[in-house]
């Protein structure tokens, strides 16, 4: 019997290995809203969290309970009270909050404990720890409204949490915390997750919401946002009256976390099976990241980038789209190359060859990874090469191309005669290849 070859599985595993190594030993804070816990996909999310733990990732899981609390209040005919979009937790509400949060804690602990069942790791034990790692204090009175048992964080015992993580446990935190006087307070899961990520110096904070991420005007997922961009999104939603959706709540925390040193915050959907794994173990992820520094950088190439450039351009050379370059030639000309790199993978490149006497430059060896050709990476490279040419005192830019004629024409290049090429370039023109010459004024 011939076994079926799973090519996609092999390729996926190969691509995920660098991320497995990168994430091992790092601390991630995962925020699960009550909506995520209610969803039918929650069992899969818990299994994926168990998988992350088995890969050596240090995990703090923070759960919320808004819908469960509201359901408990409704069942007991107790009207919920809010002031400035914050729940007012009176004594009766507090008892119902503690019931809902306690039930969820036991349920999540049980699910995490058995998350590796029916997997090759069955039998491996996951230790889930909860405790009084957070000390709370009351919100107090605002505009004459007493928030009663609604609270905020006073301090976090990060050393105790680190000891639990060092021992291999998953730390589970709910929305109820106690004060130094022994009173219980209702906190928001967003504040808990955000402050934990900051205090623990977490590598990532991950939030599960109903949407896959932040979308643009065309409905496409925005893969990255800087904190100021995320803040603008929050303010735009608040102007529409959206103060408490999962996305808005998470973005508020993500902005604060990133500005306080958390490298990346990820917004993904609890409705998408495997979203957590796709986000963490693929180059482009599946949701939206809030980052202080982009995972994608455009910069001048160095000698260490030659391998990545060769891997990118070889298929195009084999198809006859690019002129073949040897490693030795690349080594000599590497200072002329600009690359776009994403998570240490070269996804686009281009070179600028100046002809100072004629005040003209050639943009050559333009290549974009197949996964990114529908995006704007080519335009980004063109803008950067044009800027470099202008800084070098050049007034025109030309390209030789056999396949991308229309692309360059749409961006201001016009076909010209070979005679307009610099003399030294004209002498090297390959008449068998019959490349078209297009030129643009740099202005």
Swiss-Prot record:
Reaction equation(s) it catalyzes: L-glutamate + acetyl-CoA = N-acetyl-L-glutamate + CoA + H(+)
Domain N-acetyltransferase: 296-443
Activity regulation remarks: Feedback inhibition by L-arginine.
Enzyme type, top EC level: transferase
Keyword presence, tRNA processing: no
UniProt key word Cytoplasm: yes
Family of this protein: Belongs to the acetyltransferase family. ArgA subfamily.
PANTHER family cross-referenced by the UniProt entry: AMINO-ACID ACETYLTRANSFERASE, AMINO-ACID ACETYLTRANSFERASE NAGS1, CHLOROPLASTIC-RELATED
Quaternary state and interactors: Homohexamer.
Name of the protein in question: Amino-acid acetyltransferase
